Amino acid sequence: MSDPLPAIAYDLFSKIDLRVATVLAAEAHPNADKLLKLKLDDGTPEGRQVCAGVRAWYDPATLVGKQVVIVANLEPRMLRGEVSAGMILAASDLKAEAVIGAEGKPGPEARDVVFLSVDKPVKAGSKVS
């Protein structure tokens, strides 16, 4: 476990917009070995694309339909030529850096990083508090 960060004021935390999103599509990022590119239903008509550094832990095909928790109000950034408009929250207990297996699939320690999710389906775009 990593060392805890210093406490922050509640008003800083209240500025973070946490939402539930549903993964509509997931694929390997074309320009980065460690990233996946995900299309999310975030409750808006246009949805959003997010890039996540979880390629060593997740097979993209297993993510479609999964509900995840996102930081919805991060400014979009370019990650290796692809827009990432938000961040998917994940927990990790990493002992060593994961390595992608021979066939491009996650290695044997596939659960070292896990996405945060909801325990029952909710409407995409639902606020997390």
What are these regions (language model features)?
Residues 1-129:
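Phosphate-backbone binding interfaces of nucleic-acid-interacting proteins
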